[in-house]
């Protein structure tokens, strides 16, 4: 769902970014990072607003942490299991596969730390953590589905949905002002209600 959102909402240079792509952090650091972050956050909120979707990574565990209707899952496995799976899927040597895994891990970790000043493996960011060393994909998926359908999880209230709308609009306005060359250190953007934007500046 998130990738569809990216295609729908992003284009041009920023649309090329992918949290998991090799070389991401190098490109990210040299390409107006705050504009990218604003648009990324806006897309996360817009996609989440539609409901019943799956967002993979991209800081969603941080951005949606205050919404009770968002269920955050971390799935991980041993390096050995990851190497075996990727080597078989992509036909790479074990040495090349290990280098690629290390590179992607560093890029994801670097992105998350830069964007949110947190470590993405912090267990407090997740509602469910699954180690797939002894579980196959279907079993792990079944655990996630069962938990997501639990009565313990709340559906998104109207207030939560409206908050996502306002946050998405706020981030888009913030990005547009940055793109126009405004000094955002002297500007405050507020969205008190859907469709209404207040911009305050200090001259």
Task: Give, region by region, the residue ranges found by the protein language model.
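N-terminal targeting leaders
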Residues: 114, 118-123, 129, 134-203
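Signal for well-folded cores of large energy- and translation-related assemblies
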Residues: 48, 64-65, 87, 102, ...
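Small-molecule kinase domains that catalyze NTP-dependent phosphoryl transfer to phosphate-bearing small molecules
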Residues: 2-19, 94-137, 165, 175, ...
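Conserved phosphate-donor/acceptor-positioning beta-strand/loop module used by diverse small-molecule
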Residues: 66-87, 94-99
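Short, polar loop motifs at secondary-structure junctions
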Residues: 57-62
